[in-house]
């Protein structure tokens, strides 16, 4: 096995193959959107932010625009956390915060029922990253350990972004599976 060292808590031997805590199969748009169905969302913090250059690019908006940032941790069946997710919504949708974490309803669905928004277009980008020190402590991993980052952007019927979620999954806690067939 592999030895993992953590300052202040000693070393431990772990498996060469990490245990996957959550698997998401993707065979249709409906399955993409059901990511939250089997998980529980815990809101850690929310605040109105003004976008800097980096966030403006991610949110496809102007610099210095206001958005509600909601910091969350997602759990699969009360196990270790599977991801840290920052959710960004427009300030006029700030009542969303009072409706999150009550069940497994996806955030875009809650927004839809509260504000009559339809997700007409969803984009998804995945790439490798590393966990920063603040989140690593909460997620129970070493700082700078590898992560899978998934950015989802939800656009309404007017091609306007109404939600962006940036999820950071520590290595071994999430598997994304997709089967495709030529038609």
Regions found by a protein language model. Give the residues of each.
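HTH-adjacent hinge/linker in prokaryotic transcriptional regulators
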Residues: 1-66, 95-120, 175-183
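A general secondary-structure boundary signal
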Residues: 9-11, 85, 161, 165
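Conserved beta-strand segments that form the floor/walls of ligand-binding pockets within enzyme
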Residues: 12, 69, 88, 149
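A short glycine-rich, His/Asp/Glu-containing loop-to-beta-strand
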Residues: 41, 69-70, 81-87, 167-169
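Short, catalytically relevant binding-site loops at active-site mouths
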Residues: 50, 75, 88-91
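C-terminal regulatory/effector modules of DNA-binding transcriptional regulators
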Residues: 60-64, 79-80, 90-93, 97-101, ...
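Hydrophobic beta-strand positions
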Residues: 73-74, 154
């Amino acid at each position: 096995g592999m030895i993992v060292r953590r300052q202040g808590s000693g070393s431990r031997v772990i498996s060469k193959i990490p245990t996957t805590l959550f698997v998401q199969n993707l065979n249709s748009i409906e399955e993409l959107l059901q990511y939250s169905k089997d998980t529980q969302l815990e809101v850690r913090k929310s605040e109105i932010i003004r976008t800097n250059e980096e966030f403006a690019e991610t949110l496809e908006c102007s610099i210095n625009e206001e958005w509600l940032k909601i910091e969350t941790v997602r759990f699969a069946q009360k196990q270790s956390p599977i991801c840290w997710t920052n959710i960004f919504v427009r300030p006029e949708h700030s009542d969303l915060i009072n409706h999150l974490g009550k069940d497994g309803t996806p955030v875009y669905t809650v927004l839809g029922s509260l504000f009559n928004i339809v997700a007409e277009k969803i984009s998804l980008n995945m790439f490798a990253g590393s966990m920063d020190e603040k989140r690593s402590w909460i997620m129970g991993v070493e700082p700078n350990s590898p992560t899978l980052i998934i950015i989802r952007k939800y656009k309404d019927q007017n091609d306007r972004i109404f939600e962006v979620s940036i999820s950071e999954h520590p290595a071994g806690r999430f598997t994304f599976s997709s089967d495709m067939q030529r038609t």
